[in-house]
């Protein structure tokens, strides 16, 4: 019985809820300014892939972000700008060089697909912990 108790205690201590895990991630140190080069690979239902190469710059703890699309050639020059505000709706805009126009992403369009991906424009915004539900999934080994 003593050994069983010793085996169960660590499971209880280290068994965190989804909200506790999200809170721990939210509180970890993070850079205030960040620049990165990213590749987004989109795969359609037939297995054909399309790669988007982009450069992203985030400032003020990701409250301000600009993404420049570099690849493929027909998307080169498209830019996305996001500025988050505390006292009003966040700003989101796309520069579309083919039309020589800036397109504002309205609040009702935030759920639309971002550049043909499974991401929505809303997914690119910061999240407040209290506004979401969190569920811890079963532990599993991923990729080996």
Named regions from a protein language model:
Residues 11, 32, 63:
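Residue-level signal for beta-strand positions within conserved beta-sheet cores that form or flank
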Residues 38-42, 55, 65-71:
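Short beta-strand segments that buttress and anchor functional surface loops
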Residues 69, 78-82:
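Extended, compositionally biased flexible segments
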Residues 16-33, 39-41, 48-50, 74-76, ...:
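Flexible, processing/modification-adjacent segments and terminal tails
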Residues 25, 54-59:
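Extended lipid/amphipathic-ligand handling interfaces
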Residues 3-14:
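Sec-dependent N-terminal signal peptides
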Residues 57-65, 83-90:
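Short, solvent-exposed coil/turn segments at beta-strand boundaries
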């Amino acid at each position: 019985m003593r050994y069983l108790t010793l085996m169960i205690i660590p499971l209880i201590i280290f068994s965190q809820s989804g909200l506790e895990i999200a809170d721990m991630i939210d509180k970890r140190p993070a850079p205030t300014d960040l620049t990165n080069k990213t590749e987004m690979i989109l795969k359609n239902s037939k297995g054909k892939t399309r790669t988007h190469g982009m450069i992203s710059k985030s400032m003020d703890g990701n409250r301000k972000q600009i993404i420049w699309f570099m690849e493929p050639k027909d998307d080169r020059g498209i830019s996305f700008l996001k500025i988050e505000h505390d006292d009003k709706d966040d700003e989101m805009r796309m520069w579309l060089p083919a039309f020589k126009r800036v397109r504002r992403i309205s609040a009702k369009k935030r759920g639309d697909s971002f550049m043909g991906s499974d991401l929505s424009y809303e997914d690119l915004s910061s999240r407040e912990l209290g506004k979401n539900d969190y569920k811890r999934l079963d532990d599993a080994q991923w990729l080996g």
